[in-house]
């Protein structure tokens, strides 16, 4: 079968080649020539209309038609762009919820992490607060113990004072006088020293006064002698 198909195809090709050789023109060339003829005739028709319009004053109408033809593709392009823009805007809101979902999913772990982080510092703060309270309790207990020791020490002192008072009461008046004298010597010595200084000053002043008196007596005697 394959051999038959190949043979038939070769025969058909040979027939086509023979026809092309006889005509001298390929079908592609024929189509191209026909298209060029149509375009040339169309252009000639347009040029003729333009010439007639110029003669009759229909040129503005032709220009308006040409502008309308030019504006129509532009309007179509704008509409296409607007359609594409709306499609993109619709796609953007459609995709935004999807983007929000991962963001929410990302926020959830972050919130969990924050919760864990807050719980850990809170536990640490609680532990530190307990240690501080224990330290304060120990410090509070230490002053109380000191206060307890203070009255305990004061009690023996107070107990010693009445004993000393009783001993002092038991002593004789002579001992009291001796104690008062022993306490007073500094003042007495100061008074005695002041008295001695005053006496010395008086003794020094007396010779000076006597010398002055003697001089006063000698002066009248000398005056009498001179007289």
Swiss-Prot record:
The modification Phosphoserine is found at residues 41, 86, 96, 142, 144-145, 192-193. SMART domains: IQ (SM00015). Changing residue 4 to S: Loss of palmitoylation. Residues 1-227 are annotated as: Disordered. Residues 85-97, 128-139, 159-193 have a biased composition (Low complexity). Coiled coil: none annotated. It is found in: Cell membrane; Cell projection, Growth cone membrane; Synapse; Cell projection, Filopodium membrane. It comes from the Eukaryota. GO terms for biological process: astrocyte differentiation; axon choice point recognition; axon guidance; cell fate commitment; radial glial cell differentiation; regulation of filopodium assembly; regulation of growth; regulation of postsynaptic specialization assembly. Residues 31-60 form the IQ domain. Belongs to the neuromodulin family. This is Neuromodulin. It comes from Mus musculus.
